[in-house]
Protein backbone atom coordinates (compact mmCIF):
# COMPACT_ATOMS: atom_id res chain seq x y z
CA UNK A 1 0.00 0.00 0.00
CA UNK A 2 1.35 3.41 -1.02
CA UNK A 3 0.34 5.93 1.63
CA UNK A 4 -0.09 9.65 1.39
CA UNK A 5 0.33 11.63 4.58
CA UNK A 6 -3.12 12.37 6.05
CA UNK A 7 -4.10 16.01 6.37
CA UNK A 8 -5.83 16.72 9.67
CA UNK A 9 -7.64 19.80 11.03
CA UNK A 10 -5.35 22.45 12.60
CA UNK A 11 -6.24 21.34 16.14
CA UNK A 12 -4.96 17.82 15.44
CA UNK A 13 -1.40 16.59 15.00
CA UNK A 14 -0.93 13.35 13.09
CA UNK A 15 1.74 10.82 14.07
CA UNK A 16 2.52 7.85 11.81
CA UNK A 17 2.72 4.80 14.10
CA UNK A 18 3.93 2.27 11.54
CA UNK A 19 3.21 -1.26 12.80
CA UNK A 20 2.79 -0.08 16.42
CA UNK A 21 -0.60 0.26 18.10
CA UNK A 22 -1.80 3.89 17.85
CA UNK A 23 -4.07 3.48 20.89
CA UNK A 24 -1.14 2.41 23.07
CA UNK A 25 1.03 5.22 21.71
CA UNK A 26 -1.70 7.81 22.35
CA UNK A 27 -2.21 6.64 25.94
CA UNK A 28 1.54 6.63 26.62
CA UNK A 29 2.02 10.10 25.17
CA UNK A 30 -1.04 11.40 27.02
CA UNK A 31 0.41 10.10 30.27
CA UNK A 32 3.59 12.02 29.51
CA UNK A 33 1.62 15.24 29.16
CA UNK A 34 1.31 15.63 25.40
CA UNK A 35 -1.13 18.22 24.13
CA UNK A 36 -4.68 17.31 23.20
CA UNK A 37 -5.16 16.66 19.51
CA UNK A 38 -2.36 14.13 19.02
CA UNK A 39 -3.61 11.57 16.51
CA UNK A 40 -1.36 8.51 16.01
CA UNK A 41 -2.45 6.37 13.05
CA UNK A 42 -1.53 3.16 11.26
CA UNK A 43 -2.69 1.79 7.90
CA UNK A 44 -2.17 -1.57 6.21
CA UNK A 45 -4.01 -3.25 3.35
CA UNK A 46 -6.25 -4.97 5.88
CA UNK A 47 -6.68 -2.55 8.77
CA UNK A 48 -7.00 1.11 9.73
CA UNK A 49 -6.10 2.07 13.29
CA UNK A 50 -6.02 5.49 14.90
CA UNK A 51 -6.39 7.18 18.27
CA UNK A 52 -7.13 10.70 19.44
CA UNK A 53 -5.91 12.35 22.65
CA UNK A 54 -8.44 14.63 24.36
CA UNK A 55 -8.19 16.91 27.39
CA UNK A 56 -11.75 17.31 28.72
CA UNK A 57 -12.72 20.10 31.08
CA UNK A 58 -15.42 18.24 32.98
CA UNK A 59 -15.73 15.19 35.25
CA UNK A 60 -15.15 11.82 33.63
CA UNK A 61 -18.81 10.73 33.69
CA UNK A 62 -19.73 13.63 31.41
CA UNK A 63 -16.56 13.61 29.34
CA UNK A 64 -17.23 10.02 28.23
CA UNK A 65 -19.70 11.44 25.69
CA UNK A 66 -16.61 11.95 23.52
CA UNK A 67 -16.65 8.19 22.93
CA UNK A 68 -20.07 8.48 21.31
CA UNK A 69 -19.07 11.65 19.44
CA UNK A 70 -16.19 9.83 17.76
CA UNK A 71 -18.50 6.95 16.88
CA UNK A 72 -20.96 9.29 15.21
CA UNK A 73 -18.00 10.94 13.50
CA UNK A 74 -17.06 7.60 11.97
CA UNK A 75 -20.59 6.98 10.74
CA UNK A 76 -20.67 10.45 9.20
CA UNK A 77 -17.34 9.81 7.49
CA UNK A 78 -18.43 6.44 6.12
CA UNK A 79 -21.77 7.89 5.11
CA UNK A 80 -20.05 10.53 3.01
CA UNK A 81 -17.66 8.10 1.29
CA UNK A 82 -19.52 4.78 0.99
CA UNK A 83 -22.33 3.71 -1.36
CA UNK A 84 -25.72 5.08 -0.24
CA UNK A 85 -27.12 1.65 0.63
CA UNK A 86 -24.37 0.99 3.19
CA UNK A 87 -25.74 0.70 6.74
CA UNK A 88 -23.42 1.69 9.60
CA UNK A 89 -24.43 1.01 13.21
CA UNK A 90 -22.68 1.59 16.53
CA UNK A 91 -22.80 -0.91 19.38
CA UNK A 92 -23.04 0.70 22.82
CA UNK A 93 -19.85 -1.13 23.81
CA UNK A 94 -17.95 0.35 20.86
CA UNK A 95 -18.36 -2.26 18.16
CA UNK A 96 -18.85 -1.04 14.60
CA UNK A 97 -21.37 -2.82 12.37
CA UNK A 98 -21.34 -2.55 8.60
CA UNK A 99 -24.48 -3.97 6.97
CA UNK A 100 -24.99 -5.97 10.17
CA UNK A 101 -21.52 -7.52 10.41
CA UNK A 102 -18.68 -6.61 12.76
CA UNK A 103 -16.00 -4.59 11.02
CA UNK A 104 -14.11 -2.97 13.88
CA UNK A 105 -14.58 -1.05 17.07
CA UNK A 106 -13.90 1.97 19.23
CA UNK A 107 -11.81 1.87 22.39
CA UNK A 108 -11.49 4.31 25.27
CA UNK A 109 -9.02 4.90 28.10
CA UNK A 110 -8.54 7.72 30.60
CA UNK A 111 -6.13 8.91 33.26
CA UNK A 112 -8.68 7.97 35.94
CA UNK A 113 -11.58 5.56 36.34
CA UNK A 114 -13.32 7.71 38.97
CA UNK A 115 -16.51 9.04 37.32
CA UNK A 116 -16.49 12.15 39.51
CA UNK A 117 -12.84 13.03 38.93
CA UNK A 118 -11.54 15.47 36.32
CA UNK A 119 -9.42 13.38 33.94
CA UNK A 120 -6.08 14.71 32.73
CA UNK A 121 -6.74 12.98 29.42
CA UNK A 122 -9.04 10.66 27.52
CA UNK A 123 -8.00 8.63 24.48
CA UNK A 124 -10.48 7.38 21.89
CA UNK A 125 -9.17 4.59 19.68
CA UNK A 126 -10.49 3.32 16.35
CA UNK A 127 -9.93 -0.01 14.60
CA UNK A 128 -11.55 -0.70 11.25
CA UNK A 129 -11.18 -3.78 9.06
CA UNK A 130 -10.58 -2.75 5.47
CA UNK A 131 -10.31 -6.26 4.00
CA UNK A 132 -10.57 -9.75 5.45
CA UNK A 133 -7.35 -11.79 5.23
CA UNK A 134 -7.46 -14.33 2.39
CA UNK A 135 -10.89 -12.98 1.44
CA UNK A 136 -10.57 -14.55 -2.00
CA UNK A 137 -10.68 -17.99 -0.40
CA UNK A 138 -13.85 -17.28 1.59
CA UNK A 139 -17.25 -18.38 0.36
CA UNK A 140 -20.11 -15.83 0.58
CA UNK A 141 -21.67 -16.06 4.03
CA UNK A 142 -18.75 -18.03 5.46
CA UNK A 143 -18.07 -15.32 8.07
CA UNK A 144 -21.57 -13.90 8.73
CA UNK A 145 -20.60 -12.07 11.93
CA UNK A 146 -17.39 -10.54 10.60
CA UNK A 147 -16.98 -8.35 7.58
CA UNK A 148 -14.81 -5.59 6.13
CA UNK A 149 -15.20 -2.53 3.96
CA UNK A 150 -14.04 -4.42 0.87
CA UNK A 151 -16.60 -7.17 1.46
CA UNK A 152 -19.44 -4.64 1.76
CA UNK A 153 -18.92 -2.72 -1.46
CA UNK A 154 -16.70 -0.08 0.14
CA UNK A 155 -13.38 -1.35 -1.16
CA UNK A 156 -12.91 1.73 -3.35
CA UNK A 157 -12.81 4.07 -0.36
CA UNK A 158 -9.37 5.63 0.08
CA UNK A 159 -8.40 4.72 3.67
CA UNK A 160 -6.41 7.94 4.05
CA UNK A 161 -9.47 9.94 3.01
CA UNK A 162 -11.56 7.93 5.49
CA UNK A 163 -9.09 8.64 8.29
CA UNK A 164 -9.13 12.34 7.46
CA UNK A 165 -12.93 12.37 7.34
CA UNK A 166 -13.19 10.60 10.71
CA UNK A 167 -10.94 13.25 12.25
CA UNK A 168 -12.96 16.12 10.74
CA UNK A 169 -16.40 14.76 11.61
CA UNK A 170 -15.33 13.73 15.12
CA UNK A 171 -13.97 17.22 15.74
CA UNK A 172 -17.31 18.72 14.70
CA UNK A 173 -19.15 16.60 17.26
CA UNK A 174 -16.56 17.15 19.97
CA UNK A 175 -16.96 20.90 19.49
CA UNK A 176 -20.74 20.46 19.50
CA UNK A 177 -20.50 18.95 22.98
CA UNK A 178 -19.19 22.29 24.24
CA UNK A 179 -22.45 24.04 23.31
CA UNK A 180 -25.54 24.23 25.51
CA UNK A 181 -27.51 21.94 23.21
CA UNK A 182 -24.60 19.80 22.04
CA UNK A 183 -25.30 16.77 24.19
CA UNK A 184 -28.93 16.66 23.06
CA UNK A 185 -27.87 17.04 19.42
CA UNK A 186 -25.37 14.21 19.77
CA UNK A 187 -27.98 12.01 21.42
CA UNK A 188 -30.45 12.53 18.59
CA UNK A 189 -27.84 11.60 15.99
CA UNK A 190 -26.43 8.68 18.00
CA UNK A 191 -29.85 7.23 18.84
CA UNK A 192 -30.57 6.59 15.17
CA UNK A 193 -27.31 4.67 14.79
CA UNK A 194 -27.10 2.56 17.93
CA UNK A 195 -27.33 -1.20 17.43
CA UNK A 196 -30.21 -3.22 18.95
CA UNK A 197 -31.85 -0.34 20.82
CA UNK A 198 -35.13 -1.61 22.28
CA UNK A 199 -34.15 -5.24 21.74
CA UNK A 200 -32.86 -8.14 23.80
CA UNK A 201 -29.06 -8.08 23.94
CA UNK A 202 -26.05 -9.57 25.66
CA UNK A 203 -23.63 -6.85 26.79
CA UNK A 204 -19.98 -8.00 26.54
CA UNK A 205 -18.46 -6.11 29.48
CA UNK A 206 -14.93 -6.69 30.83
CA UNK A 207 -16.10 -8.65 33.89
CA UNK A 208 -19.59 -9.87 33.01
CA UNK A 209 -22.09 -10.42 30.19
CA UNK A 210 -25.45 -9.12 31.44
CA UNK A 211 -28.56 -9.81 29.36
CA UNK A 212 -31.77 -7.87 29.00
CA UNK A 213 -33.66 -5.32 26.95
CA UNK A 214 -31.66 -2.26 25.90
CA UNK A 215 -34.15 0.45 26.93
CA UNK A 216 -31.99 3.49 26.22
CA UNK A 217 -29.35 5.65 27.88
CA UNK A 218 -29.11 8.32 30.57
CA UNK A 219 -27.74 11.84 30.14
CA UNK A 220 -24.17 10.49 30.18
CA UNK A 221 -24.94 7.76 27.62
CA UNK A 222 -24.95 5.05 30.28
CA UNK A 223 -26.95 1.99 29.22
CA UNK A 224 -30.35 1.37 30.81
CA UNK A 225 -30.79 -2.41 30.76
CA UNK A 226 -33.94 -4.28 31.83
CA UNK A 227 -33.15 -7.92 32.72
CA UNK A 228 -35.81 -10.60 32.37
CA UNK A 229 -35.88 -10.81 36.15
CA UNK A 230 -34.85 -8.24 38.70
CA UNK A 231 -34.52 -4.49 38.65
CA UNK A 232 -33.58 -2.29 35.72
CA UNK A 233 -29.92 -1.36 35.97
CA UNK A 234 -27.74 1.46 34.72
CA UNK A 235 -24.36 0.53 33.22
CA UNK A 236 -22.15 3.64 33.14
CA UNK A 237 -20.15 4.31 30.00
CA UNK A 238 -17.06 4.39 32.23
CA UNK A 239 -17.43 0.60 32.47
CA UNK A 240 -15.87 0.45 29.00
CA UNK A 241 -12.60 2.12 30.05
CA UNK A 242 -9.63 -0.06 29.16
CA UNK A 243 -6.40 -0.58 31.09
CA UNK A 244 -3.32 0.46 29.14
Model-derived features: positions:
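Catalytic palm active-site di-aspartate
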Residues: 88-100
Amino acid sequence: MTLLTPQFPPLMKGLAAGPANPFTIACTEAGRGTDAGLLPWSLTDERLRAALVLAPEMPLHGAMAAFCACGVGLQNALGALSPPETAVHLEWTGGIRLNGGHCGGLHVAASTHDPAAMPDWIVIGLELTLALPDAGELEPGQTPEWTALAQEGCGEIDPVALLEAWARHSLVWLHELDSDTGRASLYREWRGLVWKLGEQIIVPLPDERPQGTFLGVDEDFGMVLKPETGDTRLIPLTTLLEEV
